[in-house]
């Protein structure tokens, strides 16, 4: 299984603690690099986050599981993957957290754009991964970041933003809400819920 990393993210006065395995982190980076192949001149962080969100949503609707083990939080301008957001924010900090060094190898951030010199390890990308990623990239690659932000303000994002008014620590978007916003049918929602119940019971 490999080592498990304890990840603490402090965002908008909110602390989240995650335990991600080496394989999960590697998969997250691989998906990131896969998307960035379509942006040789770099991509705005906001656009990258939205493409990831829509790919995650499509994957949940089609297969009842997540594409990447990264929770999405409802930031002001749209959903953002929590772990990736924290890593990219760390680039601006001196020194960068040592635990992020491997993830950042081959990735650079300048102002609000991210660039990649590394290639994705396709051993971590399945056929179903590729289908959902390619669909999101094709559909949104040329969309203006501001328009893409508006498109990402779906019901799942709105519900999370509403929760923040009562409790700033509740800005994570649940995968069931993401699937519902993507119009997953009742059977798929029930399947996702059952998997979550089992996972929580085993954790």
Q: Language model features by range: what are they?
A:
Residues 2-203:
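Domain-edge interaction signal
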